[in-house]
Swiss-Prot record:
Component of the A-type ATP synthase that produces ATP from ADP in the presence of a proton gradient across the membrane. The B chain is a regulatory subunit. It holds the Pfam family ATP-synt_ab. This is A-type ATP synthase subunit B. The keyword Membrane applies. Its main location: membrane. GO terms for biological process: proton motive force-driven plasma membrane ATP synthesis. PROSITE patterns: ATPASE_ALPHA_BETA.
């Protein structure tokens, strides 16, 4: 272990020290203050004879007389099944007042990419209890499905709802229910948001099956880049060593990318698009690609990263690059939010690329794909007609067009809108879908198999009259 007492400058969260030998990039550092307090940091920049260290806990109490110890290793996460139910800060230290964590082992937080040959294709359904996701943009075990939101929208409420409600439905054939866990990584959140998260986790009992990492807005930027890696290292251990199905929720990835930009500026790197580092695509891929399933292992890692699009712009580098790497997106819509729709998910620009592999008979229900396709088509038709109504008025529309307008309104009010406390099973979601589709004449249901229409279509006086 190398120890120095050569601090030359302290600037904000940065400490600069002179060294007489090469120091590794990202190496972990312990700084002991003259008062005996020990703080941890990470090497941000290492040049000949001088290193820049970003301190996790802030630089208060550190002066030129402090001792700097270079530990010769990068950050490692102590992993154990006992992490379930615990709350940690953004650098992996417990902050819940619980007992000391005794790890089974310590793992490098960078992790290793899953060998493509040993990957198993994601194809089992995860039920979030949210109709707009389960019914229209189904989440599949091992998938990475981001939520695209914007400033002022209730993405945190949706994140908590998913963390609370998400389950892997019981395998009826084996009669066994797989163990399910949630790893929740919050980056750059305010103290108020952190308190809301913890109150919700504790009130609903979701904390028992969760590991929570919280990096606050006033914590150092380098810690923000560490938090998702700690969360994913924990998830990989629970999934591939302990056979859990783990859902990783990361919020807010925009704060993570801002931290990358801040660190890049401190290193005087040549910036890329809009000042973000040129390697941001690779960096994000290193996080997102840690989702998946491995042959011969029972567990899985599924990711829901949440990001706020600056200026509601989906061409901004953060959502743009995220869209290239991930397998779809869920859009939080500002107009739906202003109408009081909760959660305000717009199904039309949303997409789950792996949905078709995780639904159908034996997974969800035989009619799932057809119902989803038909609702997409009917809602899109209703949306187009809304634009027409603004020009010609509703009385100028045909009876058929009015039915589609009514469908669009009921679809938003009854299917998408369910509140943040309602947990719907996939059966409930599909039944609501049939209830809405049954307001349209059977002749309009051209995306659904006739046998399914006979089994599920709800005939009423209006429909019979329309058919006649």
């Amino acid at each position: 272990m190398k120890e120095y007492q050569t601090i030359t400058e302290i600037s904000g969260p940065l400490v600069f020290a002179e060294v007489d030998e090469p120091i590794g990039y990202d190496e972990i550092v312990e700084i002991e203050t003259p008062q005996g307090e020990t703080k941890r940091g990470q090497v941000l920049e290492s040049s000949e004879g001088l290193v820049a260290i970003q301190v996790f806990e802030g630089t208060s109490g550190i002066d030129r007389n402090a001792s700097v110890r270079f530990l010769g290793e990068t950050l490692k996460m102590p992993v154990t099944e006992d992490l379930l139910g615990r709350v940690l800060d953004g650098s992996g230290q417990p902050i819940d007042g619980g007992p000391e964590i005794v790890p089974d082992e310590r793992r490098d937080i960078v992790g290793a990419a899953i060998n493509p040959y040993s990957r198993e294709y994601p194809e089992e359904f995860i039920q979030t209890g949210v109709s707009a996701i389960d019914g229209m943009n189904t989440l599949v075990r091992g998938q990475k499905l981001p939520i695209f939101s914007a400033s002022g929208l209730p993405h945190n409420d949706l994140a908590l709802q998913i963390a609370r409600q998400a389950t892997v439905p019981e395998d009826e054939e084996s009669g066994e229910e797989s163990e399910f866990a949630v790893v929740f990584g919050a980056m750059g959140i305010t103290q108020e948001e952190a308190n809301e998260f913890m109150e919700d986790f504790e009130r609903t009992g979701a904390l028992e099956r969760s590991v929570v990492f919280t990096n606050l807005a006033d914590d150092p930027a380098v810690e923000r880049t560490v938090t998702p890696r700690l969360a994913l290292t924990t998830a990989e251990y629970l999934a591939f060593d302990k056979d859990y199905h783990v859902l990783v929720i990361l919020t807010d990835m925009t704060n993570y990318c801002e931290a990358l930009r801040e660190i890049g500026a401190a290193r005087e790197e040549v910036p890329g698009r809009r000042g973000y580092p040129g390697y941001m695509y690779t960096d994000l891929a290193q996080l997102y690609e840690r989702a998946g399933r491995i042959q011969g292992r029972d567990g899985s890692v599924t990711q829901i990263p949440i990001l706020t699009m600056p200026g509601d712009d989906d061409t901004h580098p953060i959502p743009d690059l995220t869209g290239y790497i991930t397998e779809g997106q869920i859009y939080i819509d500002r107009d739906l939010n202003s109408q009081g729709i909760r959660p305000p998910i717009n199904p039309l620009p949303s997409l789950s690329r792996l949905m078709d592999d995780g639904i159908g008979e034996g997974l969800t229900r035989e009619d799932h794909a057809d119902v989803s396709d038909q609702m997409y088509a009917a809602y899109a038709e209703g949306e187009d007609l809304r634009d027409l109504v603004n020009i010609v008025g509703r009385e100028a529309l045909s009876e058929r067009d009015n039915k589609y307008l009514d469908f669009a309104e009921r679809f938003e009010a009854e299917f998408v809108n369910q509140g943040f406390d309602t947990d719907r099973s996939i059966e409930d979601t599909l039944d609501i879908g049939w209830d809405l589709l049954s307001t349209l004449p059977k002749s309009e249901l051209n995306r659904i198999d006739e046998e399914l229409i006979e089994d599920y279509y709800e005939d009423d006086a209006e429909s019979v009259e329309a058919e006649a």
